[in-house]
Design a protein with these regions (language model features):
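ATP-dependent phospho-/nucleotidyl transfer catalytic cores
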Residues: 23-98, 146
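Conserved kinase catalytic-core helix
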Residues: 1-35
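Helical subdomain adjoining the active site within ATP-dependent kinase catalytic cores
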Residues: 49-62, 83, 87, 181-205
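Gram-positive cell-envelope targeting signals
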Residues: 8-11, 15, 55-60, 70, ...
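Active-site activation/catalytic loop segments of kinase-like enzymes and analogous catalytic loops
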Residues: 127-158, 169-190, 194
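A glycine-centered beta->alpha junction motif in the catalytic cores
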Residues: 1, 12-16, 42-56, 170-188
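All-alpha amphipathic helical-bundle segments outside canonical DNA-binding/catalytic cores
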Residues: 27, 159-167
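Active-site acidic catalytic loop and adjacent metal/ATP-binding pocket
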Residues: 78-131
């Protein structure tokens, strides 16, 4: 995937280390922990509602049948979050690069000179944000296992970056809009597929 080569090159050529305090890491830890627990409580509440019903709709049954996948994802994220915090709490520098901050396949122009377009959201931050956004936007369209392996060969991620990426892609997202029962089935099936896909592309720690 030529796009990931451009992204890895971007991150490599713009790398720097910025000062960071324990308070900033603690703030990020708390934000991630709150997001994980909010998502967990959302799905746990629905599980408890559905399990008490005598008859379930197809979408409710789909969630009940696959709830163990969601449950395991939460505890994986919480475990990884604690490991991440242990790794970073004594660090005073954070590695950052120029990031595109909204990567999608449609923003990659491939011709004689390949390049990225739509830089409205660029900033200097941890490079895993680009990886996460690309995965979040294109996980249904691209096989990411080889893509991220290629990226890591060109721009090797630090252990704390790998853990943070794993947390982001493994946290069950929430889609609260309800249209009809069919769409509820599609929504839950998509979430399960997303979590299964995420479990295959997380970095080894």
């Amino acid at each position: 995937m030529d796009m990931i080569e451009i992204v890895a090159l971007l991150h490599t050529k713009t790398i720097s280390f910025k000062d960071i305090t324990l308070d900033k890491y603690k703030e990020l830890y708390d934000n991630l922990n709150n997001n994980i627990n909010y998502s967990f409580n959302y799905y746990e509440e629905r599980f408890n509602q559905y399990i008490q019903k005598e008859y379930n709709t197809p979408s409710e049954f789909l969630l009940l049948r696959n709830y163990s996948i969601i449950y395991e994802a939460f505890y994986y994220c919480l475990d990884m979050l604690d490991k991440w915090y242990v790794l970073v709490k004594d660090k005073t520098k954070q590695r950052v690069s120029l990031i595109h901050n909204n990567l999608k396949l449609e923003q990659f122009i491939h011709n004689t000179d390949s390049y990225l377009i739509s830089w409205d959201n660029y900033r200097y931050d941890t490079p895993i944000i680009d990886l996460y956004n690309l995965y979040k936007n294109e996980w249904e369209n691209v096989s990411f296992l080889d893509v991220f392996s290629e990226y890591n060969n060109s721009f090797e991620l630090l252990e704390e970056e790998k853990i943070l990426f794993n947390i982001l892609v493994s946290t069950p997202y929430i889609d609260e809009k309800y249209i009809n029962e069919y769409d509820e089935c599609v929504k839950y099936r998509k979430l399960i597929n997303y979590l299964n896909c995420s479990s295959k592309i997380i970095f080894d720690i």
